[in-house]
Amino acid sequence: MSWDQVWIDVNLATMDPSISAPYGAITNAAMAVKDGKIAWLGPRSELPAFDVLSIPVYRGKGGWITPGLIDAHTHLIFAGNRANEFELRLQGASYEEIARSGGGIISTVKACREADEAELFELGRQRLNALAKEGVTTVEIKSGYGLDTETELKILRVARELGKHHHVDVKTTFLGAHAIPPEYKDNSDGYVDLIINKMLPAVIAENLADAVDVFCENIAFNLEQTERVLSAAKAAGLEIKLHAEQLTNMGGSALAARLGAKSVDHIEYLDEAGVKALSESGTCAVLLPGAFYFLRETQKPPIDLLRQYGVPMVLASDFNPGSSPICSTLLMLNMGCTLFRLTPEEALKGLTLNAAKALGIEDNVGSLLVGKQADFCLWDIATPAQLAYSYGVNPCKDVVKNGKLVHQ
């Protein structure tokens, strides 16, 4: 056989649902890569003969290979920090109170408007490197810290540039509808007009976004405004998603499902009717335990209902300066299990196959299958559950992206 590389002495957590074993596991396995794709995988005993003198062979020393991790919800590009708000919350102020007093998102908006693209790029590069060291091979990055046309475009341009200069694939999301900027404080509908009539066309003209998101909440955008933005995005051919039911149940998830959104994110206050709507539309539920933890919330997402209705559950970092300044997907695996009571298998699926579904890229990445992109990680672990069980010592040994060894 003519391959570019072969991996032996490994176990595979394929996350292939057609394999009945937990994690879609194949133990005592091997895998071959050709032209950036997975060319063969299966039991080591069935590996076809190949020229060991001309094809590089990598020995996994009994470790586990998983698909490359996918962080499907981040706000990775921003300037400044909000440590002062952290102190205020510990003194009793709520996230909502801080936001209504001009803090929160708006304070980061000010810092991002003042920062240039070079500064934002370097900050983003450092954060992307941190995720990459934990096995992340695809990341979603949202705008939303500009809230004016110029700065929203600036953030999205930086995200696109990161994707061009880093081995991690970057999917971009336009989140102009993240908060009401101060200049539109008493005219939120006017700001929605600006998003639809000026911002969105400018984003599309430069091909800066793969999707559009809205923060549907009582401190941000109401249902009517949310539908206007998402409908405009959908009409332009972009994927849509929604921050919904984080602080209250406004019915945003049902709206997103009706419009065919790829995902609804946060969903702590989602009810059974909303879960049923997601199930019927095939919309993913993105769980963000980092924000739940950091804001010291008590209302948990309806995990049992999501299981009951078969809604794909995704885990993501929600890395951002205000509610989840936690740049770690491995920690999300642990938090998903300890805080939301996911199983380790559900958690890993939420950072691989289901995360790919949330971004609409599941045909190419998210599981180990012949013909899929060769994005995978070798972990120094005895069982896949260890990825969620223990945190602090990074067990990621090798990362392969598009068939190339990028981290060793």
UniProtKB/Swiss-Prot annotation:
Residues annotated to bind 4-imidazolone-5-propanoate: R82, Y145, H178, Q246, S323
Entry's Gene Ontology molecular function annotations: imidazolonepropionase activity; iron ion binding; zinc ion binding
Cofactor(s) needed: Zn(2+); Fe(3+)
Predominant subcellular localization, coarse grouping: cytoplasm
Pfam families: Amidohydro_1
InterPro entries: Amidohydro-rel, HutI, Metal-dep_hydrolase_composite, Metal_Hydrolase
Family according to the record: Belongs to the metallo-dependent hydrolases superfamily. HutI family.
GO biological process: L-histidine catabolic process to glutamate and formamide; L-histidine catabolic process to glutamate and formate
Cofactor: binding details: Binds 1 zinc or iron ion per subunit.
Role this protein plays: Catalyzes the hydrolytic cleavage of the carbon-nitrogen bond in imidazolone-5-propanoate to yield N-formimidoyl-L-glutamate. It is the third step in the universal histidine degradation pathway.
Residues binding Zn(2+), per UniProt: H73, H75, H243, D318
UniProt name for this protein: Imidazolonepropionase
Superkingdom to which the source organism belongs: Bacteria
Binding site for N-formimidoyl-L-glutamate: Y145, N320, G322
Keywords for the protein's UniProt record, in alphabetical order: Cytoplasm, Histidine metabolism, Hydrolase, Iron, Metal-binding, Zinc
EC assignment: 3.5.2.7
Reaction catalysis annotation: 4-imidazolone-5-propanoate + H2O = N-formimidoyl-L-glutamate
Binding site for Fe(3+): H73, H75, H243, D318
Annotated metabolic or biological route of this protein: Amino-acid degradation; L-histidine degradation into L-glutamate; N-formimidoyl-L-glutamate from L-histidine: step 3/3
Organism, scientific name: Shewanella baltica (strain OS195)
